[in-house]
């Protein structure tokens, strides 16, 4: 048995270890490639350039190699935002691939611009898209540069791409059943849904809408509505589509925030998207605001600028209304409400009179309609009091005075609803819940009036009410009238929207009603399930004998579950604790049946009270909190809809005066009858070209004004968006990475500069060392004798002329003696070009003229150094080596005169003894060895003023036609041959 058990010993040390190996091995990088990618990562420009240049020659590395993270050198440079390296890599034609997409995702604008302007080589191999999708690319095939740029919402990148002429595929409708959509969904439903989501995410980009749409408001409205509808179909991506819809709504609101004047606001809100140049249109009907309400753009409608314009129109006749005391407001409204019949009669008689125009104002119209409805409710209250109680037993009672007074209001309400449905359309009428409530209320009143007429005609005798039939017309009419009264009173809640305190509460109540309807659906299902079970259990135990009262409304409840309807009532009232537990008992000794019945009844109460009722409370609390969080937006949107209903033309007169035909209505009716019903139809008089032209010019002017305002709004919005993005960006990990990359790049740049400076210094030192070595070697070779170097022969005067031809010319002029013949030498061999050394040039080729700072009188006494003819006397004196210090602003150098082909060492000696001849020349000495003999050569360096230098230049013309070049410095003048 021991062999079935694992025993650990020293012979099996690895039995408890899991061996690991790389399953998906990748190709390893060579050391050169690793160094190449590492240099790109660190931003070492010089090393990367060297690697690329060597790769072109020796092919040591693959410039398109990939690191373990799947990044090429170009992608690494893009990730580090190193534009210099990106430009360098592109210049060597590295493989681009998806680099543009990576640059867009990284939002490197400079890299995107470089990649867009980069022309791919004609011979570059293109990778098949299927391979890019599965192996090489991080992006799906439906992701294009413009779609990815729109996802990032980078305005600058989107602008660069749009300027290149890119396009976005147009998405099909939500419920499109075309062949393309059906086939794409059947082949790969996930890719089809993802592709649709990516396209809509790109189209919902605020930067793309602002840049490419002629009417950004209309585009945002339609796209938001379409995304909201799409979220109901694509339930899997509901949250994404709802977020995109909110993004479009917020963009429209932010764009409207940029308006700065009432003129701009009116141009935007009054613009029509379906403008026709030849149709006459009103320019002050708030068409764009109506469109926003239709698309439920609550953020746009509740925007402060929009609300300010609406408030100014609402209180047109009362500019200081909001600043008045509340008591003054109440008194004013009460007086206007009492006078609404007078205003209505004046409008009927003279619509253009001051009082007739006064009632057409939106605020006055609202007060008059409210006063009329309050009067109607007061009449309903009077009708419910039954002041006259003499005909209570009449089966068909005639209408009372109050009921006759109520009738015109009911007819006025019905006429108003018909007119509203005719003007706005059936679809818009149904979408408003208050209209549905009005429809139910008016239907109840019509049914009540009809039943009362039937009862008045059919039943005229007196009969005690207890003996009436259950479905008597009068009884049914009274029940319907009572229900209609409830609806009429609740209809007053709609007026709470105009108040800032009651408006949010009314909106919360409306949202809670939706939750109650959802709860009732689940509750009814539970109620029906338990009612069916209890009725099936207690159906056999129904009691009928000896009962004067049957049901749960009796003093002693019985037969609570005998029928399905009675069971439903019993379960409903049990929620409120109105059903006793003994209703589950039966007369027979069937304890098991009683136990099952009581258990079912108790389970129902637990589910309905503990679970469902608490769920309803939680739902209502959630709805109220949702409205409370957005109370301002919700209330302003509801108030705007109320205000817009009074801004409309028509519906001026309140009920019941709206049923009275006005002269204007009679004229319209006669005109309609004459046009449509008469045999001889009126022919429409054609309009003149002048009228059409003026109308077209007005509409075109409105369009141009709108486009101008939109251009300004877009500019302000983009500037604000960029400014807010920079403000909210803050310090992130990416910022520290970029800073680290910049420091690394700067480090390598500085190292490169220092390395180059050090190299140039070493090269110059080597050059000077080589020149000194060559001079020493020349001296050694010349000291051996003239037998080894017979190429060039110099005389004493040739040497003098070579060193200082200018001084020699001056000296020969003044001494009237010849200073030697012209120098005839062979052209020296070409040497490598070296850097100009000012001091060396002075020592080798130039004259050094001391520029005196003394006055003109002292300049004549300056010492002048020249070559003396007493060479023989100095030869006997022996070698004398002395140094001259050139005093030129602190410049001191040792003058080692080195002449090619001349084996000598000449040292300029400054005679401090101040030996001056009659010509003002100071004697200096130069020791020159010739054939192991030292010859003392007296040298002259003329020190002449800078002002006299130009005049003395002419003296050298007779001596040499090739004038020396003269360079003037601050304190001295240098003359070079």
Curated annotation (Swiss-Prot):
Superkingdom, taxonomy of origin: Eukaryota
Extracellular-side positions: 384-403, 454-475, 535-599
Swiss-Prot/TrEMBL ANK repeat ranges: 29-60, 71-93, 96-118, 141-165
Subcellular location: Cell membrane
Coiled-coil intervals: 223-260
Keywords, comma-separated and alphabetical: ANK repeat, Calcium, Calcium channel, Calcium transport, Cell membrane, Coiled coil, Disulfide bond, Ion channel, Ion transport, Membrane, Phosphoprotein, Repeat, Transmembrane, Transmembrane helix, Transport
Chief site of localization: membrane
Region (Disordered) location: 762-790
Residue stretches of biased makeup (Low complexity): 764-775
Reaction catalysed by this enzyme: Ca(2+)(in) = Ca(2+)(out)
Other comment: The interaction with spectrin is important in controlling the translocation of TRPC4 channels to the plasma membrane following EGF stimulation. The cell membrane presentation, the calcium entry function and the interaction with junctional proteins (CTNNB1 and CDH5) are controlled by endothelial cell-cell contacts.
Annotated family: Belongs to the transient receptor (TC 1.A.4) family. STrpC subfamily. TRPC4 sub-subfamily.
The protein's name: Short transient receptor potential channel 4
Organism: Homo sapiens (Human)
Name of the encoding gene: TRPC4
């Amino acid at each position: 048995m021991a062999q079935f058990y694992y025993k650990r010993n020293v012979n099996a040390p690895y039995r408890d270890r899991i061996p690991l190996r790389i399953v998906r091995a990748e190709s390893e990088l060579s050391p050169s490639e690793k160094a190449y990618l590492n240099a790109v990562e660190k931003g070492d420009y010089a090393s990367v350039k060297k690697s690329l240049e060597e790769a072109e020659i020796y092919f040591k590395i693959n410039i398109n190699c990939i690191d373990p993270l799947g990044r090429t050198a170009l992608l690494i440079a893009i990730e580090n935002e190193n534009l210099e390296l990106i430009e360098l890599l592109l210049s060597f034609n590295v493989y681009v691939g998806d680099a543009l997409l990576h640059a867009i995702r990284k939002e490197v604008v400079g890299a995107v611009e470089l990649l867009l302007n980069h022309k791919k080589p004609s011979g570059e191999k293109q990778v098949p898209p299927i391979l890019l999708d599965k192996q090489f690319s991080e992006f799906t095939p439906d992701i294009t540069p413009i779609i990815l740029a729109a996802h990032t919402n980078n305005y600058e990148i989107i602008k660069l791409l749009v300027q290149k002429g890119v396009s976005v595929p147009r998405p099909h409708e939500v419920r499109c059943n075309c062949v393309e959509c059906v086939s794409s969904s059947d082949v790969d439903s996930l890719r089809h849904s993802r592709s649709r989501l990516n396209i809509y995410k790109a189209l919902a980009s605020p930067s793309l809408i602002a840049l490419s749409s002629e009417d950004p408001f209309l585009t945002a409205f339609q796209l938001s509505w379409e995304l909201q509808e799409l979220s109901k179909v694509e339930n899997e991506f509901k949250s994404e589509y709802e977020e995109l819809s909110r993004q479009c709504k917020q963009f429209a609101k932010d764009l409207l925030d940029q308006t700065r004047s009432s003129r701009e606001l009116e141009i935007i809100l009054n613009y029509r998207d379906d403008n026709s140049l030849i149709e006459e249109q009103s320019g002050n009907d708030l068409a764009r605001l109506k469109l926003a309400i239709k698309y439920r753009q609550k953020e746009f409608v509740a925007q402060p600028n929009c609300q300010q314009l609406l408030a100014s129109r609402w209180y047109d006749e009362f500019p200081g209304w909001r600043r008045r005391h509340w008591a003054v407001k109440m008194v004013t409204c009460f007086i206007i409400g009492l006078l609404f019949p007078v205003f209505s009669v004046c409008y009927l008689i003279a619509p253009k009179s001051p009082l007739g125009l006064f009632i057409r104002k939106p605020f006055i119209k609202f007060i008059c309609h409210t006063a009329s409805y309050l009067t109607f409710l007061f009449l309903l209250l009077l009708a419910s009091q039954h002041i006259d109680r003499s005909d209570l037993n009449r089966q068909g009672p005639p209408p009372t005075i109050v009921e006759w007074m109520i009738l015109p209001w009911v007819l006025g309400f019905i006429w108003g609803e018909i007119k509203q449905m005719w003007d706005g359309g059936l679809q818009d009428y149904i979408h408003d819940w208050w209209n549905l409530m009005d429809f139910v209320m008016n239907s109840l009143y019509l049914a009540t009036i009809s039943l009362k007429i039937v009862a008045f005609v059919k039943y005229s005798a007196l009969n005690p009410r207890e003996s009436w039939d259950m479905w008597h017309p009068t009884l049914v009419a009274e029940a319907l009238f009572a229900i209609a009264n409830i609806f009429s009173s609740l209809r007053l809640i709609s007026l709470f929207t105009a108040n800032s305190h009651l408006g949010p509460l009314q909106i919360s109540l409306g949202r809670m009603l939706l939750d109650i309807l959802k709860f009732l659906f689940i509750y009814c299902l539970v109620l029906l399930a338990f009612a069916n079970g209890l009725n099936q259990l207690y159906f056999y135990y129904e009691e009928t004998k000896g009962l004067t009262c049957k049901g749960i409304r009796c003093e002693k409840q019985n037969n609570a579950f005998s029928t399905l309807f009675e069971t439903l009532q019993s379960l409903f009232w049990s929620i409120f604790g109105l059903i006793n537990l003994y209703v589950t008992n039966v007369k027979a000794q069937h304890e098991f049946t009683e136990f099952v019945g009581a258990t079912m009844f108790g389970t129902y109460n637990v589910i309905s009270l503990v679970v469902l009722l608490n769920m309803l409370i939680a739902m209502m609390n959630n709805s109220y909190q949702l409205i409370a969080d957005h109370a301002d937006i919700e209330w302003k949107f509801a108030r705007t809809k109320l205000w817009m209903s009074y801004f409309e033309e028509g519906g001026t007169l309140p009920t019941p005066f709206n049923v009275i035909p006005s002269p204007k209505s009679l004229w319209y009716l006669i005109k309609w009858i004459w046009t449509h019903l008469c045999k001889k139809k009126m022919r429409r008089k054609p309009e003149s070209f002048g009228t059409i032209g003026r109308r077209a010019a007005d509409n075109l002017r409105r369009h141009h004004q709108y486009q101008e305002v939109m251009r300004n709004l877009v500019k302000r919005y983009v500037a604000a968006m960029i400014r807010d993005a920079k403000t909210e960006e803050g310090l992130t990990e990416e910022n520290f990475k970029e800073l680290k990359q910049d420091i690394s790049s700067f480090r390598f740049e500085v190292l490169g500069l220092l390395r180059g400076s050090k190299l140039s210094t070493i090269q110059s030192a080597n050059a000077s060392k080589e020149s000194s070595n060559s001079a020493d070697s020349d001296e050694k070779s010349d000291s051996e004798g003239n037998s080894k170097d017979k190429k060039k022969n110099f005389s004493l005067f040739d040497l003098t002329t070579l060193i200082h031809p200018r001084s020699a010319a001056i000296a020969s002029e003044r001494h009237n003696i010849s200073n030697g013949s012209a120098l005839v030498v062979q052209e020296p061999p070409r040497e490598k070009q070296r850097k100009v050394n000012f001091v060396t040039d002075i020592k080798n080729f130039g004259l050094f003229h001391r520029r005196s700072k003394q006055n003109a009188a002292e300049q004549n006494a300056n010492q002048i150094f020249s070559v003396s003819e007493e060479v023989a006397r100095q030869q006997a004196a022996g070698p004398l080596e002395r140094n001259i210090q050139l005093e030129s602003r602190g410049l001191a150098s040792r003058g080692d005169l080195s002449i090619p082909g001349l084996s000598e060492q000449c040292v300029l000696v400054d005679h401090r003894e101040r030996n001056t001849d009659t010509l003002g020349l100071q004697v200096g000495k130069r020791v020159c060895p010739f054939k192991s003999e030292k010859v003392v050569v007296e040298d002259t360096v003329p020190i002449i003023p800078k002002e006299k230098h130009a005049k003395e230049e002419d003296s050298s013309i007779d001596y040499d036609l090739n004038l020396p070049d003269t360079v003037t410095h601050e304190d001295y003048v240098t003359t070079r041959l």
